[in-house]
Amino acid sequence: MKDLLKFLKAQTKNEDFDAIKISLASPDMIRSWSFGEVKKPETINYRTFKPERDGLFCARIFGPVKDYECLCGKYKRLKHRGVICEKCGVEVTQSKVRRERMGHIELSSPTAHIWFLKSLPSRIGLLLDMPLRDIERVLYFESYVVIETGMTNLEKRQILTEEQYLDALEEFGDEFYATMGAEAIQSLLKDINLVKECENLRIELNETNSETKRKKLTKRIKLLESFIQSNNKPEWMILTVLPVLPPDLRPLVPLDGGRFATSDLNDLYRRVINRNNRLKRLLDLAAPDIIVRNEKRMLQEAIDALLDNGRRGRAITGSNKRPLKSLADMIKGKQGRFRQNLLGKRVDYSGRSVITVGPYLRLHQCGLPKKMALELFKPFIYGKLEVRGLATTIKAAKKMVEREEAIVWDILDEVIREHPVLLNRAPTLHRLGIQAFEPVLIEGKAIQLHPLVCAAYNADFDGDQMAVHVPLTLEAQLEARALMMSTNNILSPANGEPIIVPSQDVVLGLYYMTREKINGKGEGMILNGSNEAEKVYRLEIAELHSLVKVRITEYKKNKDQSFIPKTKIINTTIGRAILWMIVPKGLPFSIVNQTLGKKDISKMLNTCYRILGLKPTVAFADQIMYTGFAYAARSGASVGIDDMVIPVKKLNIIHEAEIEVAEIQEQFQSGLVTAGERYNKVIDIWAAANERVAKAMMENLSTESVFNKKGEKQKQISFNSIFMMADSGARGSAAQIRQLAGMRGLMAKPDGSIIETPITANFREGLNVLQYFISTHGARKGLADTALKTANSGYLTRRLVDVAQDLVVTQNDCGTHEGILMTPLIEGGDVKEPLRERVLGRVTAEKILIPNTENILIERNTLLNEQWCDLLEKNSIDNVKVRSVVNCETDFGVCAYCYGRDLARGNLVNKGEAIGVIAAQSIGEPGTQLTMRTFHIGGAASRAATESSIQIKNKGIINLNNAKSVTNSSGKIVITSRNVELNIIDNFRRTKETYKVPYGAIMAKGHGEQVNSGETVAKWDPHTIPVITEVSGFVRFVDMIDGQSITRQADELTGLSSIVVLDTAERMTIGKDLRPSLKIVDRDGNDVLISGTEMPAQYFLPGKAIVQLDDRVQISSGDTLARVPQESGGTKDITGGLPRVADLFEARRPKELAILAEISGIISFGKETKGKRRLIITPVDGSDAYEEMIPKWRQLNVFEGERVERGDVISDGPESPHDILRLRGVQAVTKYIVNEVQEVYRLQGVKINDKHIEVIIRQMLRKATVIKSGNSEFLDGEQVEFSRIKISNRILNKQSKIPATFSRDLLGITKASLATESFISAASFQETTRVLTESAVAGKKDELRGLKENVIVGRLIPAGTGYAYHKERLNRRHTVNTNQIKPNNSSSQISAEEASASLSELLNSTLIQHDHT
C-alpha cells in the first residue's frame, strides 16, 4: 500500500507555489530541461505517420504518441508503465508528457538572443556600452571587434573593418586578438566583472555633472545591479543551446488527401536544424572562412526568426506569403497566449437565445425555454433518474431524455427548483452585465427577461440576444444566489442610486395615474380609504384624476423597528389613493401625493431602500411595475399626427427673423459689418427664432384651458399624449418635440461649422429635398461617431481595468489623519453639486464641530449616511474633511475607512472587495454615452466666454479671497492681484456662489459688504488687461524712444493719440535692448516706493501695450497706466467627451500649457534672447533665484516686481497635471483630475461617484522618484513603487538611519499598467516582449498579488470570496513554516481525500483497460 501511495504521490506534481520568477536560462539549465537532442529536421514519416527518430517529433525524446504504448508496439498496457523499450527507446507512459517534455539543439556556433539585442533599449548594448549598430555589424559578420589588445595601441571593444583588421594583423601580428560573430560578443560579455564595473560607474556618477551622462550612467548601474542581484550571467544572453518546444504545443495534423496542417514553429525549427547541421559539417571539413561565416550568419538569422520573426530585417514568409508566427507572436497581442487563452477563456457549456419581455415575472425570475433547460441541466437529470432508479445506466437515462418522456419534465422541474442560472448580455461593460435569476420553465424558444433589469443590462427587445450559464458547484450556486441575484443588485455600483428603475410604459402609467384634472367626474368626494377609491373608479363613479379627500393611514418607523400608525384626511386624487395601496408600510403618503415622473419614482425607490431595506424595496419595485403597465394600458396614450400642435405664431416669428437677416445682409453689402460678423449675427438670429418657436410650441402643448365647477376658465396641464410622454420622462424630450412640431433649426456641415440657413419646417409639415439633404450630414456623422466611439470607449475601459485591477480592500483602518477637504461645487451662481452629495458615504477624517462653538457634532471616522448628512445641512456646515483612497496608508490595497460606503450595498465596504475593477467599470461603462466631438466655441458658448461683470443671484455678504486692492480717484476699489475668488456667503456662513475676479476689475462693493440679488458687484473690460498703479505720483517714461521702442498712433474716430509699445521682434537693432517702462516719481523726481516693500514703483510694459498718458502727468493710485490688448482666443477647440477623459487619465501634457511659478518670490525679467524672455523669481528669504525661459508670444499674467506664490499661474493656459502635482501636491492634483473628469460626465448627465476617479488617481500616483537615497537600497533618480519606499523608510527610521527622500510621480494609466510590480500583469497588457525582456534580465519575482496574475496562473482571485481562500492559504503556510513536521513520518502522511482521489484514478484507468479488452 505504501508503495502504491508513493507511486501515486509521484504521479501528481506539487502545484503549490507563492510566486513566479523569470530569469535568463543558462545553457546547463536548458540541457537539464531537455529529454534529448533533436538532431534531424524530419518530423513524421508521411507513410506510416510515425514520428522519425531524433527528429522534431521523436517519441524517444518527447514521449509516446499513444497512452502507455511504445512506438514499436512491444510494450502496451498500464502494467508496463515506466519501462523503457529496448528496441525503440520510448518510455511507456501517458501521451500527455508530449505537452511538457522539451528537447534541445546544440548550436555549433553561439547565437545572440534577438530580444536582448534588438528590444530597445538593447540590454547587450547597454552592458557593453557599445552602439547597437556596431554590435549588429559584429554579429552579422560585417566587422571585427577587438577582444584582447595585448601590447598594441588598439582599444578593447574597438570595431575594425576588414581592411583595418588586415592592416592591424600586418602591423602587430599575434599581439592582439580580434574576431567577429556571436563568439566575439560572448567573450566580451564573459570578461565583464559586474561588481567592479558597478563600483567604477558609481564613482564616475559622483564626479560627473552633465545631466545626459548621469542618465546614461544610472541606466547602466541599474542594469549591472540587476544582473548582480538576480545571479544572471551576461553571457547567457548569447545562446549556445537552443531549447525545443514540446511537440504537442506545435502540432502537426494530417489532413485528408495526404496533406498536413502544421504550426509555423515546425518550419522555423526545421530551418534552424538544417543550418546548424550544415554548419557542423562545414566546421568538420574545415571549410574556407568565408563559407563558414556565411553559414553562421544564416544560423543567426534563422534563430532570430524562430524567436521573434520580423524584429530584424524582413520577416520570413511561409508558402502562403504570410509571415510565419514565431514564439514571440505566440504570446503577444490580442490573439496571443495571454489574452486569448489565459485571460479570455471560453465557457464550456452555455445556451443563447433572443430575449423577450416577461412582464409577469418577479424580479428574481427569468423565463427559460424548456428545451434549453433540458439541454443545460442534462447531467443533473441523468443523476436524478439514476438515483430514483428510473434508469439503470447513464445510457438508459440518455435515451429517456432524448425521447422526452413525461417523467423527464417532472425531474427537470425538481432539478431547476432554486437552482439559479446566470444571464449575460454582451457587451458586459460592468458587473451588472451578468446577473443570476431563478429559472421559470416556459414554452417557446425565447428567454424572458424582467423589464426592470433592462437598464442594468442596457438591453431592449429589438432582437438582443443573451447567454445562459449554469453554476455547477454548490459554492458557485451559493455565490450566484447571495451575490449575483438580481434582487441583490438594486443599486448601481457607479453612483449608489437605484438601477432597478422603471422606464417607458411603467413611468407613463404611474404618471397618468397621479396626474390631477380640474372638474373631473366625482370631484370633491370624500372617501374612507384606498379601497373605496378603487371601487368608485371601477364603478365609473369617479375619474382617475379627480381631486378628492381620502382617509389615509401612514405608518412611521420607530427606532425599535415597530410602526406607529397615524391617520388623517388628505386632499389627493383617486389615482394616487389607488397607488398608495402598493406602497409598503413605513413610507410617507407625500411621496405618492404628487405627479410622479421618472426622477420621482427613482427617488421613491431610493427612499424605500434607505428606510426599509432590501426585501420591501424589491417587492415594491415589482408592484410598481405591474401597476404601471396596467394603468399605461388604461390610459390609452398614443401618438397621432394631431397631437403635434404647430403654434400659430410660428409663421410670424420666422417672417420677422427673415427680415432681420435681410437687414444684416444689406449692412454687409454696404461694408458696415465684416463677413464673420454677418455670419455670427445671422446664426444668432436664427437660434433666437428657434427658441421662440419652441417656447410658443411648448406653451401651446403643455397647457389647455378648461372650465372648473364654478364655470370659470382655468388653465391646467395638458393631457396631450406626446407632452405626457416627454413630461413624465417616459420617452422623448423637449428637443425632439421641437423637431416634430416647432422647427428643426440650424444644422451643421460635416466639418462641424453651422449652415446659416436653418430648416424652418418640422417633421409634421415635412421637409423638402434641400432640407432633407442638409439634415443627412448630421445623421451620418452620428453613425460614424458611434462606431468609433464604441472601440475607443472599450479601449479606455481596458486600460482602466488594467491599471486598477490589483486594488482590493485589505484592511479595516490604516489610521491616517489625511483627507480631502470637500466643499460644494459651485460655478458662478449655480450649485453644481451640493456638499451632501459629495460627502455621502464617506468617512470623516477629523471631528466636525458645530460652527462657532467647540462642541463636537460628528466624531472622526464616522461613515456619513443620509441621517448624518441631514445633520450637516441643519447646522449649515459648508466644508468637511473626508478620508480618501488617495491618502490611504495601506501598503498593498486600501483600507475600508478610506474608501467608505460600498455604493451597491449601502454599508461600509467589505474586506476583499475589488474596488479597482469596480472603479474602472464605473468610469468605462458610460464611456459609450460620451460624445466623441471636439466642440468649436460657437453660439452660446462664446457669449459665456466674454463675461465682463459679475451679477449676484443670492442675497448675502461678499467675501474676497487672496485679494489686494487699491482705491482709485473716483473712490472705487480696483483689484490688483490675480486669481481672486469672490464668494457670496449667507447668514449661516455657507458659500452660495463663487466667481473669479480678474486683475484690474472695478468693484462696486468691497469685502464684507452686504449685497442684494441682481446687483452688479464687479466690472471689467474683457478685451484688454490693464496695468494699474498702486501708488500716486507723476509718470516718468523710461526707455520709451519714438521709433525705437514705441510708436505713436492717432485714432481715426476720436483723434486722440496713443503710444503703442513695439514687440521686440518689430524693433530695430538699436531698440532691441531697451525695456520700456513707466516709473512713478514724486514732485522732486525721487522714486516712489510701493507700500510695504523696498521696491520702487516701476511698471515694465509688455509688447503691444497701449499707453494713453503723456510724460510727467500726475496720476493717483488705482488709475490705469496702460492697456494690453487680449488676443481673442478665436475658435480654440476644447476637447470634449471621451478623448478628454482619456487625456486626463493618460496625464498628457496639454499644448500651450499654463506656466506655473516653481518657487515663491518676486518676479523680474532678465536678458532676452531671440524668441524667449528670461523670467527670474527671487525668493524673499534670499535663497537661490529660479530662472526660466518663456516664449515671447506667451501672454504673462504677472508684471515685474509682483510677488507670486509657488504654484501660481504665470501664463494662462490649460494646466498640466504633472506641474500641479509637483508644485501644489497630491491633494491639488486629485481635485483637478476629479473635477475635470466629472465635468465631462456631468455634461452628458452621467453620475459617477468621485471615489471611483480617486481610485484610478491612486494607481496613477503609485510610483515615486528617489531624490536622495540616504541609507536605502535605491539609486538617486530611480523610479520606485511608492509603497516600497514607504516600507523601506519605515525600517530605516526604526534603525535610526537616513531614510530616502522622494517626489511623487504621476503616470498615465498605460504607463502605470506597464510599470506595475507584477510582470505577468504588465506582459499581458501591452508591449509583451519589452516587459518580459526587462523582467528576465532583472530576475523579477511576481508575488501574484493582483487579480490578473492569479487569473493567468489559474487560481482564485485574491478578492471577493477568493480573498478568504488566499488568507487561509497564507495562514496555513505560516503554521507549516513554524512547526516543521519531522521528515521521517511525513512521507506516509497523506490525506484521505488525496488517497481516495488517487485510487479512483488508478481504478478508472484499469477499468478502461478492461473495457478495451
Curated annotation (Swiss-Prot):
Its EC number is 2.7.7.6. Binds 1 Mg(2+) ion per subunit. It comes from the Bacteria. SMART domains: RPOLA_N (SM00663). Zn(2+) 1 binds at C70, C72, C85, C88. One of its GO terms (molecular function) is magnesium ion binding. GO terms for biological process: DNA-templated transcription. Its cofactor is Mg(2+); Zn(2+). InterPro entries: DNA-dir_RpoC_beta_prime, DNA-dir_RpoC_beta_prime_bact, RNA_pol_asu, RNA_pol_N, RNA_pol_Rpb1_1, RNA_pol_Rpb1_3, RNA_pol_Rpb1_3_sf, RNA_pol_Rpb1_4. GO terms for cellular component: DNA-directed RNA polymerase complex. It catalyses: RNA(n) + a ribonucleoside 5'-triphosphate = RNA(n+1) + diphosphate. Pfam families: RNA_pol_Rpb1_1, RNA_pol_Rpb1_2, RNA_pol_Rpb1_3, RNA_pol_Rpb1_4, RNA_pol_Rpb1_5. Zn(2+) 2 binds at C814, C888, C895, C898. Keywords: DNA-directed RNA polymerase, Magnesium, Metal-binding, Nucleotidyltransferase, Transcription, Transferase, Zinc. Gene3D superfamilies: 1.10.132.30, 1.10.150.390, 1.10.1790.20, 1.10.40.90, 2.40.40.20, 2.40.50.100, RNA polymerase II, clamp domain, RNA polymerase Rpb1, domain 3. Mg(2+) binds at D460, D462, D464. The RNAP catalytic core consists of 2 alpha, 1 beta, 1 beta' and 1 omega subunit. When a sigma factor is associated with the core the holoenzyme is formed, which can initiate transcription. PANTHER family: DNA-DIRECTED RNA POLYMERASE (PTHR19376), DNA-DIRECTED RNA POLYMERASE SUBUNIT BETA (PTHR19376:SF54). DNA-dependent RNA polymerase catalyzes the transcription of DNA into RNA using the four ribonucleoside triphosphates as substrates. Belongs to the RNA polymerase beta' chain family. This is DNA-directed RNA polymerase subunit beta'. It comes from Buchnera aphidicola subsp. Schizaphis graminum (strain Sg).
